[in-house]
Design a protein with these regions (language model features):
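Asp-based, Mg2+/Mn2+-dependent phosphohydrolase catalytic module
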Residues: 1-111
């Protein structure tokens, strides 16, 4: 489920969770906040740069605590929450951070 301007929309993750609960399907999640997508991105960064470096030099920049920030934190990279765009535009991001206990490394209004 994803927040919209005045309601919520049902997203693919909702349907896959229902399939998983039915035990009729074996579900493999690939996408934020699951580690596979972050590990793949980190591998690509190392491949393109032709060297490895500390993960704290890589940052996940996004507008969602539950996908962008949570996934970045779980994968060991820095996280940057953008607040004047996307999910938190015109919303109290500080209240949501306290409610969820998901703390980004950095908070910026825009890129």
């Amino acid at each position: 489920v994803a927040p919209q301007k005045s309601s919520f929309s049902i997203e693919p993750g909702f349907w896959s969770l229902n399939f998983h609960k039915s035990k009729k399907f074996d579900i493999k999640y690939f996408g934020k906040p699951h580690l596979d997508i972050f590990e793949k991105a980190i591998q690509n960064i190392f491949k393109i740069s032709q060297r490895k470096f500390n993960l704290d030099r890589i940052a996940m920049i996004g507008d969602s605590l539950h996908t962008d920030v949570l996934g970045g934190l779980a994968s060991g990279i820095s996280t940057v929450l953008v607040t004047n765009h996307g999910l938190f535009k015109n919303h109290d991001y500080q209240k949501e951070i306290l409610r969820t206990q998901i703390y980004p490394d950095w908070i910026i209004p825009s890129i």
